[in-house]
Amino acid sequence: MSRLLIDIGNTRLKWAWCDDAPVAAEHVVEGGAVLPSPWRHGGAAAHAVPAERSALVGTWRQLAAGTTPEIWIANVAGPTIAAAMEAVMEDAFGAVSPHWVRTTAAHGDLVNGYREPTQLGVDRWVGSIGAHRWLPGETLLIVTAGTATTLDIVTATADGARFEGGLILPGLELMLGTLARNTAQLPELDVLDTGAGAERAVRALGADNTHDAIAAGCLAAQAGAIERSWRALAGRGPVRCLLSGGARHAVAGALAMPFEMHDNLVLLGLHAMALPA
């Protein structure tokens, strides 16, 4: 059976096409991140750009070769984008009945510890499922550096694992943009402006120019939240930090703690949910 997995974030979507056929080892890892196995194809697109959505139609139609895959989707971009993606899928496959994943109180041996489980964002929940699948039995700090930066904690328990909760703060690009828009004389920077000078300034606790001072200040805020959470968890026992999201490379340069890059946790979680129980 072929499966199409789609992770729709606030600005971009990522997708994976996998099936039950054997797969060569080189297809299992892409960009340093483990992908669902068997994994055949994958990609990304800016979902608000019609041309990029249209390009998906041809790609998916070719992969389907006249069949209709089982489709699993985690969407945090809202109903307008959901409707647009429904149209893309219908163009590619004809009539479809995708599984729009929702947050639940538990999945397998992972328990959702939110006071109101359905309030937890579906991306955070499915990403936690993927992280737990990837590293079962481990206590995890899952950091997603995207439009928002989220820090989520999964702890190992005697009979499985528990999603404990986490933190949400403005993402790096939001911090940079908000500072510029709400001040009269500070320039607007983007994530690509947070380079080596900003990283040095974070470590030196100061910058000798405004550009690096802004970039380093926002990086230090991101790194400070992550490192504080990591230290608190490390004080209880072993913990592994998984770093993902579009700004992960910029944030990584400011961290003074061990971490691992893994940018496909939501796709891994969708794959786990799609497999028969």
UniProtKB/Swiss-Prot annotation:
Name of encoding gene: coaX
Family: Belongs to the type III pantothenate kinase family.
CDD domains: ASKHA_NBD_PanK-III
Subunit record text: Homodimer.
Enzymatic reactions: (R)-pantothenate + ATP = (R)-4'-phosphopantothenate + ADP + H(+)
Compartments where located: Cytoplasm
NCBIfam families for the chain: PRK13328.1-3
Residues involved in substrate binding: 114, 121-124, 210
Enzyme class: transferase
Native source species: Cupriavidus metallidurans (strain ATCC 43123 / DSM 2839 / NBRC 102507 / CH34)
Positions bound to ATP: 7-14, 147
PANTHER family: TYPE III PANTOTHENATE KINASE
GO molecular function, one term: pantothenate kinase activity
Pathway(s) the chain acts in: Cofactor biosynthesis; coenzyme A biosynthesis; CoA from (R)-pantothenate: step 1/5
Domain of life: Bacteria
Cofactor note: A monovalent cation. Ammonium or potassium.
Cofactor: NH4(+); K(+)
Function: Catalyzes the phosphorylation of pantothenate (Pan), the first step in CoA biosynthesis.
Name of the protein in question: Type III pantothenate kinase
Record-level GO BP terms: coenzyme A biosynthetic process
